[in-house]
Amino acid sequence: MMKIVIDLMGADHGVLPIIEGVSRALENKSFSAVLVGDKDKATPFISKELASKVEMIHTQDYIKMEEAATEAIKRKESSIYLGMDILKNGADALISAGHSGATMGLATLRLGRIKGVERPAICTLMPSVGKRPSVLLDAGANTDCKPEYLIDFALMGYEYAKSVLHYDSPKVGLLSNGEEDIKGNMLVKETHKMLKAYDFFYGNVEGSDIFKGVVDVVVCDGFMGNVVLKTTEGVASAIGSIFKDEIKSSFKSKMGALMLRNAFDILKQKTDYAEYGGAPLLGVNKSVIISHGKSNARAVECAIYQAISAVESQVCLRITQAFESLKPSVSAHQSDQQDA
């Protein structure tokens, strides 16, 4: 049976939403859950039925948000270190809503990078007007990048879209300040030249194209990706607040909202971060899902489904195979340019 490790510590709202999310997921999927965290804090929220389905690893130590990510390397009794150790030694996936930097650092050091991957990347799903979301990476793991890193992100995003999301022939776009080949900073221009070696490359895309579904995968450095992600979250939250205020403003607005309830439900589902679960860390040798610090039970539940899909689709193996077969084409392309 698939074994999934869940870090209980460090989330904004404590252990309760995480435990509730695990409980809901176990009602719908068959997997073995290992909870790592403070047993004294967790036990009051774990029913007898749930206790019979999960394994509890006790520790009170965890990496606080204000602490440096490097602390995780020293703190071998912290929840994320213990969880990563369990993952390394036989578990199939790990989910954490705690310190994302600590999770990324330990995943890279303890699990190792897939051969050929220079930098792992955070991959996140973005809402789209189409029937399926867009994939964005890097969403914050690497703020300073070289073109070679973005090539890695493109390959990993392509494989994730194809293997886990089952997108047929996904197209990859490079985020820029214009669609034309000449647009972008030096990083974008150099990456664009290298990505031309791949059939899946669509070309440059603008920020608005992310939500239009112009391409399936959008590649950028982690600084830009995180700005896009946080801006999107802020806009979605602001629009939601505006809607609520306007609906409450008059009886006519309330009646109109009732008539549009189904449409609002669909809109919420498409724009609610919780429905997307978490963000996979691609490029390490096991499946790691980084959840939002403010994750509610639904977000944790969906993150578990995400982890199950990643393991079942063997995404780490698919990325390994992609780097063996596809990445050499970049070197060949660069050699051709030099010869020319």
From Swiss-Prot:
GO terms for molecular function: phosphate:acyl-[acyl carrier protein] acyltransferase activity. Keywords: Cytoplasm, Lipid biosynthesis, Lipid metabolism, Phospholipid biosynthesis, Phospholipid metabolism, Transferase. It comes from the Bacteria. Its EC number is 2.3.1.274. It is found in: Cytoplasm. It is an enzyme of class 2 (transferase). Coiled coil: none annotated. One of its GO terms (biological process) is phospholipid biosynthetic process. Its main location: cytoplasm. Pathway: Lipid metabolism; phospholipid metabolism. Pfam families: FA_synthesis. This is Phosphate acyltransferase.
